[in-house]
Regions:
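Polyanion-engaging groove/track-forming segments
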Residues: 1-441
């Protein structure tokens, strides 16, 4: 049992060092299992890179897992039967039902349940409460302590919905966030862990339940190695304020070290990856200089012409996007780069996304837009929703929303809409056709 940190700045080669270390040790000790724990979105890339670097181009005693995939591996080996897991859509449906039943008890939220996006926001809030282990009692305690009326009402409503949600799913369902809680209870029983080396990479910090798992790793496995982003010019084991540039990395180190000391687990000397220029920026000293001095406020400046960093000022998003298109075409046509090697990063995807998509389509540039599309924007979904609303009361809005989706187009609907507006017809509470003679529709 031991704990070791691999530290360094961004792009300094921490992950590459870890890959090479694991590959070498896995060949020397084929009887030991190496568990690479990375965020879900990095599992495939990590596997691909390890296979590429491995002399035999295969992984026999190295497993790349996320916390969630590790949970399912453990449950499968131990024969643990899980209740049905609620996904995001399931949670939204349960919250909508529970909140609807408790509507009269909600002081602030009651009037917003029909507002588009409100249930989704409430679902995200409840998911975060589950993820960080906040109970209904914790919310009640904070509600009692605060003197701010608006905050008290919000906490009260959240407590009511959260409590109703918990009661509804009890003994029938579990949320995805609760899977790791079950893993914490079952992990000590998993025999393969005792002969495993755990490697944590790609995390800027951990949630409370992930810290509990890291603690179990330290207690029951052979060794835990964790990569953290930190500045080699600063003290790694000293706590700092939240405003500090490397607060998250140093906080993670201090918390894991404290856990190790509580269980009398030795903390090995850390490995610093601080070669200059950094591995990621070895082709660009300017970017390496920027990584070393950005937000440091030390007064250092780059004295030469920064050819690898350019600033363009456009009048509007269209002009900016047009310039980006020209840069991409130049990189591909003159410098031999491929489209997959290029990325466009924006801080306001809502404003720039449509403009970028439009310009890229015009220029014939293939792209993937990392944006989640709402299903409500689909015209067929709008057709179904309008039809259901129309069955309720046949209101003007629902009927003409239905007609304007394009699936049931009737060239006479414009004339009919004008006639409806003229007669002032808003809704039809009576059965279909009862007013047909009066309105002519």
């Amino acid at each position: 049992m031991s704990l070791q940190f691999i530290a360094g700045g961004s792009g300094s080669g921490k992950t590459r060092y870890l890959y090479e270390k694991v590959i070498k040790e896995s060949e020397e000790h084929p009887d030991i299992q190496y568990l690479f724990i990375v965020p879900e979105q990095y599992t495939m890339q990590t596997q691909k890179e390890l296979v590429r670097l491995h002399p035999r181009h295969g992984l026999l005693n190295i497993d790349v897992l996320s916390f969630k995939r590790l949970a399912y591996r453990v449950f499968e080996d131990l024969g643990v039967q899980l209740p049905q897991v609620l996904d995001d859509m399931g949670k939204s449906m349960v919250i909508r039902k529970v909140a609807g039943k408790l509507k009269k008890e909600l002081k602030l939220y009651g009037g917003h349940l029909e507002q588009p996006g409100f249930i989704n926001q409430l679902k995200s809030q409840i998911s975060e409460l589950c993820q960080y282990g906040v109970s209904v009692e914790d919310l009640a305690m904070v509600e009692e302590e605060t003197d701010r009326v608006l905050l008290k009402d919000k906490l009260g409503d959240l407590k009511t919905v959260y409590g109703g949600f918990k009661d509804y799913i009890e003994s029938h369902y579990i949320t995805a966030e609760e899977i790791l809680d079950i893993l914490c209870r079952k992990l000590p029983q998993w025999e393969p862990l005792k002969n495993s080396v755990i490697l944590l990479d790609g995390y800027t910090g951990f949630t409370p339940v992930q810290y509990r798992l890291a603690e179990l790793f330290m207690i029951h496995s052979r060794e835990v190695i964790c990569c953290v982003t930190a500045d080699p010019r600063e003290m790694l084991y000293k706590e700092c304020t939240m405003q500090h540039l490397f607060y998250m990395g140093r906080h993670t180190v201090c918390r894991l070290r404290k856990m190790a000391e509580e269980h009398h687990i030795p903390v090995l000397k850390e490995v610093w990856c601080d070669n200059r220029p950094a591995w990621r920026f070895k082709e660009s000293p300017q970017l390496d200089f920027l990584e070393q001095n950005l937000y440091r406020y030390n007064g250092k400046i780059w004295k030469n012409d920064p050819q690898d960093i350019q600033i363009f000022r456009g009048k509007n998003p269209a002009e900016e996007t047009e310039y980006v298109c020209s840069c991409i075409n130049e990189k591909v046509q003159k410098e031999g780069m491929r489209y997959r090697d290029l990325a466009v990063v924006t801080g306001d995807l809502a404003s720039y996304g449509k403009e970028i998509a439009h310009r890229f389509d015009e220029a014939g540039i293939p792209y993937f837009l990392d944006d989640k599309k709402s299903i409500l924007e689909n015209p067929f979904i709008e057709l179904i929703r309008a039809a259901l609303d129309g069955v309720k009361d046949a209101s003007y809005e629902s009927i003409f929303r239905y007609l304007k989706t394009g699936f049931v187009y009737d060239e006479t609907y414009s004339r009919e809409e004008a006639q409806v507006l003229t007669t002032g017809w808003k809704t039809m509470q009576e059965p279909w056709g009862s007013k047909a003679g009066k309105t002519g529709i």
